[in-house]
Amino acid sequence: LIIVLCNKINVTLKPVQFKDLFSSKSKEYASSRPKYPKSLFEFLVGLVPRRNLAWDCATGNGQAALFLSEYFEQVIASDASHEQIANAQPRNNIRYEVFPAERTNLADSSVDLITIAQALHWFNLDDFYKEARRVLRKHDNGGDGGRGGVIAAWAYGLHSVSAQIDTITHLLYEDILGPYWPEERKIVENRYEGMPFPFHKIETPGFQIELDWSLSELIGYVYTWSSVQKFIEKNNSDPIKQIYNDLAAAWGENQIRHKRRVVWPIYMKVGRS
């Protein structure tokens, strides 16, 4: 076990085996991935009776952890990739660690809120749920009003801009990149429906990500897709070049500066221990 202390980031390096599809583009991932709406976190925080400890599992670049740090005394932000953790933003009350979702060093019944953003479909669900039940705070008849800890998982689907641009996006996503998507991507495409979730279900309002982006910002995001990187590795060519001219024409004049509203639907599962 190696502990690396740097810029207030506590990185616990452990030998782990997992599908690492994003570490090679960790810096791009950190800068180009869409930001989740603050209203989503406000909703989740309103569900927990205590705000002592949150665990952001598979934190990636730490985006969700940063939001949680505004509400909780302490946040544990973990990921199986030390490259992702190395690009996370430090915060005084965030402790970044490297360990798999299914095997943690967290204490029993210690976590008030577990969040899993854009990652649950990668986990060994049986092992992860067992670990989540172990670390989630158990309900009691005291200060928590009989309510236990909360677990929330969400993913966002394919973005939408306009009918014309969306047609080009689907050409890239399905026809060009279709064979290069991992099998787990289908779980997101199915909106997490049918995925086991052995917790007391909590109904959630609808959330979506809305950002005003230039074409270059959107292209930067698309380059973080694992399927794009797999296509490049296998074919030694850039799949985005196949659709770029059509996409630029559909975007309109001054593609660098002109902003368009980009929307991603969010699919959520929220429950209580």
PLM-predicted stretches and their roles:
Residues 133, 137-213:
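Conserved catalytic/acceptor-binding region of the Class I
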Residues 112-126:
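A short SAM/SAH-binding and catalytic strip from SAM-dependent methyltransferases
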Residues 190-273:
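Conserved Class I S-adenosyl-L-methionine
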Residues 123-135:
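A short, conserved alpha-helix within the catalytic core of class I
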Residues 22-34:
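Class I SAM-dependent methyltransferase Rossmann-like catalytic core
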Residues 102-113:
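A short acidic, Gly/Pro-enriched loop at the edge of an enzyme's catalytic core
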Residues 34-52:
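Conserved alpha-helix/loop element of class I SAM-dependent methyltransferases that forms part
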Residues 55, 61-103:
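Class I SAM-dependent methyltransferase SAM/SAH-binding core
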